[in-house]
Swiss-Prot record:
Reaction(s) catalysed by this chain's protein: 2-deoxy-D-ribose 5-phosphate = D-glyceraldehyde 3-phosphate + acetaldehyde
Protein name, as recorded: Deoxyribose-phosphate aldolase
GO molecular function, one term: deoxyribose-phosphate aldolase activity
Superkingdom of this protein's organism: Bacteria
Protein location: Cytoplasm
């Protein structure tokens, strides 16, 4: 198992500076990570730094709350794609899910999928804020909207990925979608347990430590 190819090398903290983004991209190339995952303001920088590599540029949309309106999420997505993003990690409207306004949740995702124009869309459902029924309905909405992945967490919602959540999400989407585990993955054992549970992508700021077999405290 080549762990590096499962990893979206992530830097989403609000105080991230250009030098840190440049380091993120250099590390991703050195260690052959699948992508870097950044906020939209850094997409152009990453696209330029990674243009001659196999590392993709992933960015977050509607992050971290998911509470912005659908039109804004679609615009952010279009701008990110135009600037060089190849994958989009969007946050659902969590309140709408809990209100059972499922048409809104689905249409919100669908608007981002359409704006992404064929590029991979991962749907962050923020599992730490959801009960089992919420999680199931969120995954079904993402599936119906035509997204490519469901993703556990933003890393900003008070909790991260768990094996049980990954198993549940995979059981709902089956072979029609993939699952990204993110938040709190700090060592190789955790990473492998998420993959064994059904995850095909891992979002973490600890990718180097993970592939080297260590563990780390703090971070995403």
């Amino acid at each position: 198992m080549q762990l590096s190819r499962y990893i979206d090398h992530t830097l989403l903290k609000p105080e991230a500076q250009t030098a840190q983004i440049e380091k993120l991209c250099a590390e991703a190339k050195e260690h052959n990570f699948f992508s870097v995952c950044v906020n939209t303001s850094y997409v152009k920088t990453c696209a330029e730094l990674l243009k001659d590599s196999s590392v993709k540029v992933c960015c977050v949309v509607g992050f971290p709350l998911g509470a912005m309106d659908t039109t804004s999420k679609a615009f952010e997505t279009k701008t990110a794609i135009a600037n060089g993003a190849q994958e989009i990690d969007m946050v659902i409207q969590i309140g709408a899910l809990k209100d059972r306004r499922l048409d809104y949740v689905r249409d919100d995702i669908k608007a981002v999928v359409q704006a992404a124009n064929g590029h991979t869309v991962k749907v962050i459902i923020e599992t730490s804020l959801l009960n089992q029924e919420d999680k199931t309905l969120a995954c079904k909405a993402a599936l119906e909207a035509g997204a490519h992945f469901v993703k556990t967490s933003t890393g900003f919602g008070g909790g991260g990925a768990t094996v049980d959540d990954v198993k549940l999400m995979k059981s709902v989407v089956g072979s029609s979608m993939e699952v990204k585990a993110s938040g709190g993955i700090k060592d190789a054992q955790q990473a492998k347990s998420m993959i064994d549970a059904g995850a095909t992508r891992l979002g973490t700021s600890s990718g180097i430590t993970i592939i080297q077999g260590g563990s780390v405290q703090g971070g995403y």
